[in-house]
Design a protein with these regions (language model features):
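Basic, amphipathic "hinge/linker" alpha-helix immediately C-terminal to the N-terminal HTH DNA-binding motif
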Residues: 83-102
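Short alpha-helical segments that sit at the start of domains
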Residues: 15-34, 172
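A short, conserved structural fragment
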Residues: 73-80
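Key DNA-contact positions within bacterial/archaeal DNA-binding proteins
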Residues: 62
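Alpha-helical residues within the helix-turn-helix
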Residues: 55, 72-73
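Mid-protein regulatory/catalytic core that forms ligand/cofactor-binding pockets
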Residues: 8-17, 128-181
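N-terminal helix-turn-helix DNA-binding core of bacterial DNA-binding proteins
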Residues: 26-59
């Protein structure tokens, strides 16, 4: 397990605080966080359509358009009508921080609290908005810094990076070769 010593952690935290924009540090609503995460899940580094967001969040398209204006004012997205929405670096950092917390919470619920695989997502959806970055990092420490959640999805690192996982097509594997899916 790779752990950061306290001195390096303090330096990293100081640097990160300077690096983060005011929008990154501000407290935002659960709804704003849900939109940022949905945009990231739909499009990652590309553009997401208003209709795809409406479907993902189970809301009406006009509601999406209204929220996109707010997100753009906050500096979280770049939105061009009829061309979709893209996260800014600030929006992407916020979305990945939320996604990291969500996936770590799912892992914790399954491994330590006896939740079933089918139950963890909904519970994590509620909890992800209430936990701090400090809590998330302590949770990662407790869990041994897992790289994937119970559903097999990769857990972003503290800096928003993803674990390096090989993507070998099944057709390229040897007959009888053992692998983990």
């Amino acid at each position: 397990m790779n752990t950061v010593n306290p001195v390096d952690r303090k330096r990293l935290t100081s640097w990160y605080s300077l690096y983060m924009s005011k929008a990154d540090r501000m407290k935002v609503s659960t709804s704003i966080e849900d939109y940022l995460k949905a945009i990231w899940l739909i499009a990652k580094d590309a553009s997401a359509s208003t209709n795809a967001l409406a479907e993902q969040l189970n809301v009406a398209a006009p509601s999406v358009s209204s929220m996109l204006g707010k997100l753009q004012d906050l500096g979280f997205v770049e939105h061009e009508p009829y061309h979709g929405v893209r996260l800014t670096p600030s929006g992407s950092r916020r979305a990945l921080r939320l996604l990291r917390g969500h996936r770590l919470i799912e892992t914790f619920l399954l491994e330590h609290l006896g939740y079933t695989w089918a139950e963890v997502h909904e519970e994590a959806e509620r909890l992800e908005h209430a936990v701090s970055e400090r809590f998330t990092e302590r949770l990662a420490d407790l869990l041994g810094h897992p790289t994937h959640d119970p559903h097999g999805d990769p857990i972003p690192g503290p800096a928003g990076d993803f674990p390096n996982t090989p993507n070998t097509p099944l057709a390229e594997l040897e007959v009888g070769q053992i692998l983990e899916v």
